[in-house]
Amino acid sequence: MLNRSVYELAGGERTFKLMVERFYARVAKDPVLRSVYPEEDLSGATERLTLFLIQYWGGPATYSERRGHPRLRLRHQPFAIGHLERDAWLSHMTAAVESLDLAPAVRTALLDYFETASTAMINQPVRS
């Protein structure tokens, strides 16, 4: 068990696909976040995030094979991401993670990562 990746422990590709589908179902209805996603159809964003998370957590490196290095900050720089957007994003991702039947250690690893990563994407000053 100690040698298994979070990808494997979470249930593999199926789990990550489901998590991302649930996340984007919420994003699609969120007026704060829709402006961050320029595509009307979120299927491209869904595929990219799924592939990224699968790779990040120890699954196949399909994301890098197709898109190169993730460069998260650079890829998100064109979009205005402030604390409001970060909080909305994290709320939807937390709900998606918590909707899954995951071991507590896996859930904690995912949520800790999403909190850190989403905070790192903030590129706008605090609004007064």
Labelled PLM ranges:
Residues 1-128:
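Core of compact, soluble alpha-helical bundle domains
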